[in-house]
């Protein structure tokens, strides 16, 4: 189903343990979202047998998330891009800066008025792009965009896999209302009836 609106853009800072497993901080608002574009790159392998393709495996490799937002505040830019705020309150970006991984959550309104909710478990952003426009006869709003690389998380879920995205529609059958109402309280942690491993920690 097509989506027609985007809002409630949040991010969660990541702390990594010695083994690389992520612990997610409480989500905070990033900015007012206007657009989100997610492209995915798959790794593909083909097993040939009897002069034909016997099995084709396609696995998530990485993705690119491009967000169009109304404004990126200094503290958010510091968290997402590695820039620093100096003693005069000026945001300083250096060539040595590198963004720390974060989780990104948002929701998109569907054509039927219901929402689809998302968490991307590990995203590393670059420096935001800024568009400046001279004032002409008409008013033109110039808004920043920020691009990040999406990867799978290091921490395995209850089935021993490395998730990169969680999504749910509030009108999907079998979805608990508590999942929707608590979507931004913490980064969603997959839950399975047949848990095969102890993921441990906060998630």
Q: Could you tell me what each predicted segment is?
A:
Residues 1-77, 125-143:
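Solvent-exposed edge beta-strands and adjacent loop segments
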Residues 1-22, 101-115, 196-201:
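Short, structured interface segments that constitute the first stable element of a domain
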Residues 55-121, 126-128:
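Structured, beta-strand-rich domain cores
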Residues 128-203:
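Mixed-charge, glycine-accented linear interaction segment located at domain edges/termini
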């Amino acid at each position: 189903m097509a989506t027609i609106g985007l809002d409630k853009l949040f991010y969660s800072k990541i702390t990594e343990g010695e083994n690389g497993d992520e612990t997610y901080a409480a989500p905070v608002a990033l900015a007012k979202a206007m657009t989100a574009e997610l492209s995915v790159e798959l790794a593909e392998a083909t097993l040939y047998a009897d002069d034909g393709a016997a099995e084709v495996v396609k696995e998530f490799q990485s993705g690119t998330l491009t967000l169009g937002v109304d404004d990126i505040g200094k503290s958010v830019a510091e968290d997402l891009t590695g820039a620093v705020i100096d003693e005069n309150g000026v945001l300083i970006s250096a060539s040595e800066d590198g963004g720390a991984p974060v989780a990104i959550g948002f929701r998109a309104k569907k054509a039927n008025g219901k929402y689809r909710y998302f968490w991307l478990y590990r995203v590393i952003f670059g420096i935001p792009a800024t568009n400046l426009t001279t004032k002409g006869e008409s008013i033109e709003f110039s808004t920043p965009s920020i691009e990040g690389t999406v990867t799978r998380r290091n921490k395995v879920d209850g089935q021993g896999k490395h998730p990169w995205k969680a999504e749910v529609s509030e009108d999907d059958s079998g979805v608990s209302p508590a999942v929707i109402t608590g979507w931004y309280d913490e980064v969603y942690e997959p839950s399975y009836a047949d848990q095969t491993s102890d993921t441990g920690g906060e998630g």
